[in-house]
């Protein structure tokens, strides 16, 4: 939890907010149930939920710090050291119902964000959520060491893809029109599927349960994105 929590919050989140949220989660989501191995809620997720509801302005994704210098020669175009801008999902929320069928997420300089940008992590967002490539490397390590179950991981992605396809067919809002691939690449979906849903304490333990649990996690994540204006 101590490693995951910094990975799922914006880089400019005040440290005192993280400290308060972490203390709340450890006490009320872990210790009250008996401590390590007995908690029924993921401590890192409870921390993130506490931050979202207690300090929504800092967690909404409307404005986050964005670095404009290149990283190992990738993603250049520096004009200033950094400035704030909306995350792609933040742009979806801001767009509302005005641009149905024509929405295109852009970076802080106004350039369209490509699928390749999402995969490499050249988009604004929390530290651990932007690079799908890095998340996949982490997934390989977890699977190789047998810490996590591939059944849970795959089921989360399948559940998310199926639900996003259903919303695509409905297509009454911008959030519903986001493609399944974009849904899986944007925000914390991939990070959650790999590092959160596979938590050995709070995730399903039966083989059949892993499929059902993962599918429901992925489907619920997309439902919240598409129907909750404050995601």
Role assignments for model-derived ranges:
Residues 1, 17-23, 38-49, 150-158, ...:
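Cytoplasmic-side transmembrane-helix entry/capping segments in multi-pass membrane proteins
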Residues 11-21, 118, 122-132, 176-189:
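Structural signature of hydrophobic alpha-helical transmembrane segments
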């Amino acid at each position: 939890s101590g490693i995951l929590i910094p990975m799922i919050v914006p880089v400019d989140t005040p440290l005192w907010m993280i400290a308060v949220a972490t203390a709340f989660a450890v006490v009320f989501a872990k210790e009250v149930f008996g401590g390590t191995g007995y908690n029924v809620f993921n401590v890192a997720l409870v921390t993130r939920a506490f931050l979202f509801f207690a300090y929504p302005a800092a967690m909404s994704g409307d404005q986050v710090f964005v670095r404009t210098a290149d990283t190992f020669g990738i993603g250049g175009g520096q004009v200033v050291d950094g400035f704030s801008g909306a995350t792609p999902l933040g742009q979806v929320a801001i767009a509302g119902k005005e641009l149905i069928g024509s929405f295109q997420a852009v970076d802080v300089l106004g350039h369209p964000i490509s699928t390749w940008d999402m995969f490499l992590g050249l988009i604004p967002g929390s530290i651990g959520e932007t690079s799908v490539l890095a998340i996949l490397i982490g997934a390989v390590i977890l699977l190789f060491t047998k810490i996590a179950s591939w059944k849970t991981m795959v089921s989360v992605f399948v559940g998310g893809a199926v639900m996003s396809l259903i919303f695509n067919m409905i297509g009454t809002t911008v959030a519903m029109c986001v493609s399944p691939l974009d849904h899986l690449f944007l925000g914390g979906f991939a990070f959650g599927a790999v590092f959160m849903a596979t938590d050995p304490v709070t995730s399903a333990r039966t083989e059949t349960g892993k499929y059902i649990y993962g599918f429901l996690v992925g489907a619920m994540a997309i439902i919240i994105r598409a129907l909750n204006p404050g995601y």
